[in-house]
């Protein structure tokens, strides 16, 4: 900290020509803060200076505070030192302004027309079945062809683009390479060949999630850094998203990024046969820990389209710094048409698909997400055999329901003299004691996030544990999230409530061949 030596070294470095020069400086951590800080390894543990430390700093810097004033931890006000402020500003002007400085240019794109998202509004036709991953790829193509955002859509894939069914985009939009195609790909004779181009729009990053996430950050912050807004979609094997690069996603949030993270091949049982390394049932839970991320688990194509439409509107029209994480799956099933007036419920996180049929007999409420919704629909039919009627609900985001719950709780806590507000969950479900079964292809902790705002008799089924290599049917039976498990959970609640006799449950368990024993070699 010898300023004469410091300036002499810098002057020599500037004067040296012909090769790079490094000035190596040995400094003392906490220098200038007094003997209690300087050179002590406790600097980060010191959160507050005592009076003797303040006196040292005052005397060392020539400040005019009295000992009595120091007891109140006074600030040095800029107005009291105009000559120093003027000097500091002049130095910053020489360095092209203050750093860091965030410039927020006007958004230079518009939102696509509603028809861009409408392909699946009428559902699938005939015997056609699609997965939500397939629906996403078709929606992505529609966005890339739209006049509003087409050239600004940035698809980023670190691996498995063909697994996700994205190979049709290779020839149509090209894979970006700064020098174009430098080799003949092994699939050059097929229609959907691997096509690299200087003008390509897709980013294929190889098996490099850190690099792909960095590309996502660059694209997701380009509206601020370059005044050119893009709409990035980072598509990855869901297990290798938050589990592998959560710190980079936190960094993206810190940089106020905007874009979509698509956790493809999601689900502990839906991605079957790939064991504990790949079968993901916890990324949604991890996504909910990031304050800048909205996390979604759509069951149907129209839900997916509604969520993406809402996300683009948030980023472009509402000018929000937000990241949307969407779980999509590889299980094919018929997609129903979009019901009327469900957009609000989809975005809030919960809506009714169908009420209980008229008639006699007890009623249960079944809540599904993702492709496990098909197991819910299977349970509806099984329950009818035992005289039980079912309401069917779709939970698109337990995270959004929880955000709403916490916000309402805070308002009620701070306004005890006013009529208490209700959460969206409470508004939808009321205070009925009707048994509720919520089932997910993720850990039970995901639907459990909203237990506080649920009515009584709320039961959750999830896929806690390691993934296992087997068929979907076997996995769902093992994790107890199949139609049979949902049926038995509903009957069990009805027995507890006194609506049916225990013999009805026993009859169902016998019919489905259920054993209460479970062999899990991974249990601790």
Model regions: which residues?
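Thiamine diphosphate
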Residues: 1-336, 343-344, 399, ...
């Amino acid at each position: 900290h010898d300023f004469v030596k410091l300036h002499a070294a810098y002057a020599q470095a500037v004067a040296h020509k012909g090769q790079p020069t490094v000035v190596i400086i040995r400094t003392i951590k906490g220098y200038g803060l007094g003997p209690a800080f300087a050179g002590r390894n406790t600097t980060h543990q010191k959160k507050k200076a005592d009076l003797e430390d303040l006196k040292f700093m005052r005397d060392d810097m020539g400040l005019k505070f009295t000992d009595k004033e120091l007891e109140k931890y006074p600030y040095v006000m800029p107005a009291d030192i105009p000559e120093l402020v003027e000097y500091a500003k002049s130095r910053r002007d020489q360095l092209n302004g203050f750093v860091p400085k965030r410039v927020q240019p006007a958004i230079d794109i518009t939102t696509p027309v509603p028809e861009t998202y409408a392909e699946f509004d009428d559902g699938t036709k005939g015997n056609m079945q699609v997965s939500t991953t397939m629906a996403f790829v078709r929606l992505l193509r529609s966005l890339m062809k739209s006049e509003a955002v087409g050239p600004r859509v940035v698809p980023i894939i670190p691996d498995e683009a063909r697994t996700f069914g994205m190979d049709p985009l290779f020839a149509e939009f090209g894979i970006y390479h700064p020098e174009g195609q430098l080799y003949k790909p092994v699939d050059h004779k097929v229609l959907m060949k691997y096509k690299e181009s200087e003008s390509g729009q897709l980013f294929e990053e190889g098996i490099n999630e850190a690099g792909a996430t960095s590309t996502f950050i660059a694209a997701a912050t380009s509206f601020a850094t370059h005044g050119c807004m893009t709409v990035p979609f980072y598509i990855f094997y869901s297990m290798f998203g938050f589990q592998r690069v959560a710190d980079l996603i936190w960094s993206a949030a810190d940089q106020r990024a905007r874009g979509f993270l698509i956790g493809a091949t999601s689900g502990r049982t839906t991605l079957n046969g790939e064991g504990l390394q790949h079968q993901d049932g916890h990324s949604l839970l991890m996504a909910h820990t990031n304050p800048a991320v909205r996390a979604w688990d759509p069951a149907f194509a129209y839900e997916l389209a509604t969520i993406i439409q809402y996300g683009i509107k948030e980023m472009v029209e509402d000018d929000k710094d937000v990241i949307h994480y969407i779980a999509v799956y590889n299980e094919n099933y018929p997609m129903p048409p979009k019901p009327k007036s469900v957009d609000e419920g989809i975005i809030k996180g919960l809506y009714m698909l169908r009420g209980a049929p008229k008639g006699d007999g007890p009623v249960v409420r079944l809540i599904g997400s993702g492709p496990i919704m098909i197991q819910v629909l299977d349970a509806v039919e099984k329950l009818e055999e035992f005289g039980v009627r079912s309401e069917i609900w779709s939970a698109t985001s337990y995270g959004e329901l929880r955000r709403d719950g916490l916000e309402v709780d805070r308002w009620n806590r701070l306004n005890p003299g006013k009529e208490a507000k209700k959460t969206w969950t409470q508004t939808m479900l009321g205070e009925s004691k009707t048994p509720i079964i919520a089932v997910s292809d993720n850990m039970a902790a995901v639907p459990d996030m909203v237990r506080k705002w649920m009515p009584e008799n709320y039961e959750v089924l999830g896929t806690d544990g390691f993934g296992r290599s087997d068929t979907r049917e076997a996995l769902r039976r093992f994790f107890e999230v199949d139609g049979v498990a949902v049926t038995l959970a509903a009957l069990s609640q009805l027995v507890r409530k006194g609506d049916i006799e225990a013999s009805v449950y026993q009859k169902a368990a016998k019919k489905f061949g259920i054993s209460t024993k479970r062999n899990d070699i991974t249990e601790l």
